[in-house]
Amino acid sequence: MLLDGAQGQSYQQYHKPEKEEEKKPFVLPEKNQNMRRIYAYLTKTRGIDRDVLSVFVHAKLIYEDAKYHNAVFVGTDADGNPCHAHKRGTSTTESYKGNVESSNPKYSFHWLGQSDTLYVFEAPIDLLSFITLYQKDWELHSYVALCGTTDQPILQLLEDEPRIKKVALCLDRDAAGIKAGARIRQTLLERGCQEVFPLFPTRKDWNE
């Protein structure tokens, strides 16, 4: 029956919205019993210095997963709790990379030193390659790999570590890297960061 003489009008039936799927908890991939494959891949194929790699391994920031033998780069919060992980395949015939499900983008793979400078990279291997090239007193400085396009890891580190006053944007030397660097620089300056400057590799990225 139509009310108030309203004829020819249609009314949409109400549907209760479906319950949003609950976010799965963050879980690190199971560790392999040894790290032979990631050491071979990162040192021989990608040219990372073995001693530099070992520092990160001993800090439990890099390990090899048991199922696929990926290199896993762990990101921790201010209390040292793992809450982000980036996986990189170690096969020389297939390329794979991606973040573990439910990783918190604010806490990607990073290293904290005591100086006032933070070096920012697109990927963990770029970060390790830069340190391999410039090893002198590297542990004094801070480094972060964005593991994506977000600037959240930088903003979180600046909040957690007020001693950081300078940010070097060591992104890829390509159109995307230059554009992202300009965007991030503007954001950081607006947030009160004292000094933000680009630091480009000689070639496209720090591992070439």
Locate each region found by the language model.
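TOPRIM fold recognition
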Residues: 116, 132-208
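Phosphate-handling DNA/RNA-contact segment within nucleic-acid enzymes
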Residues: 65-160
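Residue-level signal for functionally critical sites in structured catalytic/ligand-binding pockets
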Residues: 42-45, 86-90, 122, 126-129, ...
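Basic, glycine-enriched DNA-binding surface that flanks or lies within the catalytic cores of DNA
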Residues: 9, 13-103, 109
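Short, structured coil/loop segments at alpha-helix boundaries
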Residues: 2-4, 32-39, 49-50, 65-66, ...
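Replication-associated primase and helicase/ATPase modules
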Residues: 1-33, 37-44, 168, 182-208
